[in-house]
Swiss-Prot record:
GO terms for cellular component: cytosol; nucleus. Its EC number is 3.1.3.16. This is Putative RNA polymerase II subunit B1 CTD phosphatase RPAP2 homolog. A zinc finger (RTR1-type) spans 43-131. It comes from Oryza sativa subsp. indica. Zn(2+) binds at C66, C71, C107, C111. Belongs to the RPAP2 family. It is an enzyme of class 3 (hydrolase). It holds the Pfam family RPAP2_Rtr1. Putative RNA polymerase II subunit B1 C-terminal domain (CTD) phosphatase involved in RNA polymerase II transcription regulation. GO terms for biological process: cell differentiation.
């Protein structure tokens, strides 16, 4: 007793391994430790694998105990189960087959389901790297009931209540999300992607909090250097008698010629106010210019036809409020036919667009910016008035040129062209539009002439090709003309004249000569399938299809065409039992020429043959069962394989149904019953069974006989077989 106790104590002092712990847990489950305490079975799930649990179920069933460790009931006796109990059970409702051998390891269906669910939840392999303390606690829980291992039961999540009953105590687990990623790691946000990865979606937190902060940072970074671009487009500002288009580009630069990033104003209110300030002031000045020019035009009628385009002269460079210099360029174009065609109405309208690029610091408030723009606009008005006065003085020189000088053009700045063109210089708007239309018509005529030239060259090349083919004698006239792509059209004008002459009963000899002459290329007199009306004549080579006509083949036609392409001389020789020496005598069979076997070099024939073998093997067992054949299926397959070896497979297999494939195999077997499989002759002569198969395949007896004639062109009687050429 003493040595045994010492040995057990020594075994417990040794470090516990995973294998030894699994074995001791299996033994505890085998002895029924989990029968009285079901939570122990869930504790064993942390150590056992699927195969380990299956071993426990098998050992318990051998010991006539229920295979489910949590069940204390024994297995039913053999007398209760029956000695001749079946092994499998077929469920017609679920269309499944159940193995009852596994069910015999359990006392009831409930234990079978519970055991299968528990076994499916176990991992396929044992856990790796379990600490020895946890192994000792788990083993002590099974062997000592949770008390021998100290707090081993509590460490596993099981404790004992005051009344001795074990209660399950779940361990508190707290999940912490790592905020900062270590080296070589990525955060969850980087791995999944930003929240705005979906196009058009902006999270609410980014819309409220993130947006203004980011914009503020960008404004601080670009506060030193920034620019603005304001595009003002004011159309239909005022009405006038002559069309007029004004385009003004105002640019503001710093003294240093350095590249600075452009900063767009995003305030819509500022844009509207700036647009109104600039457009109202300049359009007002522009109206005064137009009125004064009209007065001068009446006084100086001789200067109407002179050119009013001149080069610009340098003027003073305006200085803004912040000291930056501004380049201003204006262009006035009057009477442009393009703008007249675009505008609606009899009178032209002003199309005004202005662009200001200013390199200045954004003011602290919108009102300060508006004040600076108003002051800047007043300076523009004064300079523009000076430029108009200079232009008036230049209209009276001898050269007759009217030049509108730039009001803000500086020396050394980028040159820009300015021109003033009156609408009546080229006549009225209607005359200008007519000139534009005539120019477009001329370009269209030139394009048509080039197309006609290319067509003539193509026709000449086709005629030369046809003439060479006819002169060489390689082809006839009609073939050469069709190959060259030439279509000879009838003379519709002379055709009507010839018909009238024929109706007036002219000389018969002349009519005969006329018929002979024009009979060389006789145009058909039936409607043709072409889209143009030019070919809508009688007697065509292409007749219109009748009503209800369809190119889709029936199932019988599809099967007949497939057999017609498969059969070769070798097939007929094999069916009639002839040797290879007599195959030449089968050149003409049933009034048609029987070809030799053909095999494609690219391997498609073998692929088609393998697919056909699959279809035949699927249809043959059903056919044997329906016809109650006594011949083994293997022999039928071998004989059919020899027959298929003699056939030609060039085209793809037709898409047939299973009933139709069975009929195809039946045709082959019927042909083989003549010489190769004579035992099938009585079955093939049974009209009732045969008619039943024909009805299922939707084929009549006459159609079936026509398919048999492809394989038996000389008939199936012995006399016709003996009369074959040998």
């Amino acid at each position: 007793m003493g040595p045994t106790t010492a040995t057990d104590a020594g075994a417990r002092m040794k470090p516990t391994t995973v294998a030894s712990a699994v074995h001791r847990v299996q033994m505890a489950l085998y002895d029924g430790a989990a029968a009285s305490r079901e939570p122990l079975l869930r504790a064993a799930a942390s150590l056992l694998s699927g195969p380990d649990y299956a071993d426990v179920v098998t050992e318990r069933s051998i010991a006539d105990a229920c295979g489910y460790p949590a069940c204390p009931n024994p297995l039913p006796s053999e007398d209760a189960r029956g000695k001749a109990a079946p092994r499998f059970r077929i469920s017609l409702r679920e269309h499944r087959v159940y193995d009852l051998e596994e069910a015999r390891k359990f006392c009831s269906e409930r234990c079978l389901v519970a055991s299968a669910a528990f076994g499916a939840s176990l991992p396929p392999d044992r856990p790796f790297g379990v600490s020895p303390d946890r192994l000792d606690a788990l083993v002590a829980l099974f062997e000592g009931g949770g008390g021998g291992g100290g707090d081993g039961g509590l460490a596993l999540g099981f404790g004992a209540s005051g009344d001795g009953k074990e209660v399950e105590e779940g361990r508190k687990v707290e999940i912490m999300e790592k905020e900062a990623a270590g080296t070589g790691e990525v955060t969850l946000q980087e791995w999944i992607g930003p929240s705005d990865a979906i196009e058009g979606y902006v999270p609410r937190r980014d819309r409220v909090v993130g947006g203004p902060k980011k914009e503020a940072k960008q404004n601080d970074a670009c506060s030193a250097e920034q620019s603005s671009n304001i595009n003002v487009d004011s159309r239909n500002a005022s009405s006038g008698e002559s069309g007029m288009v004004l385009t003004e580009n105002t640019k503001a630069k710093k003294k240093e010629a350095t590249k600075t990033p452009l900063k767009m104003f995003k305030q819509d209110e500022d844009n509207d106010m700036l647009s109104s300030c600039i457009s109202d002031s300049i359009v007002k000045q522009l109206e005064d210019v137009v009125l004064e020019e009209k007065k001068d035009k009446k006084k100086n009628k001789a200067a109407k036809g002179t050119s009013r385009v001149g080069k610009s002269k340098p003027a003073k460079r305006p200085v803004g409020r912040d000291g930056h210099e501004v380049d201003f360029t204006s262009t006035i174009i009057m009477g442009d036919h393009g703008s007249e065609m675009m505008d609606h109405g009899a009178l032209g309208q002003y199309n005004f667009s202005s662009s200001i690029l200013a390199n200045e610091q954004p003011s602290s408030s919108q009102y300060a910016a508006i004040d600076s723009v108003q002051a800047y606009t007043e300076e523009l008005d004064e300079l523009f008035s000076n430029a108009v006065n200079i232009a008036k003085d230049e209209t009276s020189d001898d050269s007759g040129r009217c030049t509108l000088r730039s009001s803000l053009k500086a020396v050394g700045s980028k040159n820009a062209g300015r021109s003033v063109k009156w609408a009546d210089e080229n006549g009225s708007v209607l005359e200008t539009s007519r000139a534009f239309v005539s120019h477009s018509s001329k370009s269209q005529e030139s394009m048509d002439s080039s197309v006609r030239r290319e067509s003539a060259e193509a026709c000449a090349a086709a005629l030369i090709e046809a003439a060479e083919a006819i002169s060489s004698g390689t082809s006839e006239v009609e073939d050469a003309v069709s190959k060259a792509g030439i279509i000879i059209l009838p003379d519709m004008v002379n055709q009507q004249q010839y018909n009238n002459d024929y109706d007036n009963d002219k000389d018969a000899g002349e009519n005969e000569i006329f018929e002979i002459d024009r009979g060389v290329v006789k145009w058909p007199k039936k409607t043709v399938l072409l889209d143009t009306d030019m070919f809508d004549v009688d007697d065509s080579w292409h007749d219109t299809p009748p009503e209800g006509f369809s190119l889709t083949l029936s199932s019988f036609a599809t099967m007949w065409a497939a057999l017609f392409g498969w059969v070769s001389r070798s097939s007929l020789a094999y069916v009639y039992g002839l040797d290879e020496s007599s195959m030449e005598d089968l050149l003409i069979a049933g009034g048609r020429e029987c070809p030799q076997k053909r095999v494609l070099n690219d391997g498609h024939s073998s692929e088609i043959r393998r697919a056909l073998d699959t279809c035949v093997c699927n249809a043959l067992p059903v056919l044997v069962s329906n016809l109650r054949m006594q011949i083994p299926v293997s022999k039928l397959e071998i004989t059919l394989g020899y027959l298929l070896d003699t056939m030609s497979f060039v085209d793809a297999l037709p898409s047939l149904r299973s009933r139709q494939w069975q009929l195809m195999v039946l045709v082959l077997l019927d042909a083989l019953s003549l010489h190769r499989l004579p035992a099938l002759a009585p079955i093939m002569s049974d009209s009732k069974l045969l008619q039943k198969l024909l009805n299922s395949a939707q084929v009549s007896r006459e159609e079936y006989d026509s398919m048999i004639d492809l394989l038996l062109p000389f008939g199936r009687s012995t006399q016709s077989q003996a009369s074959l050429p040998s």
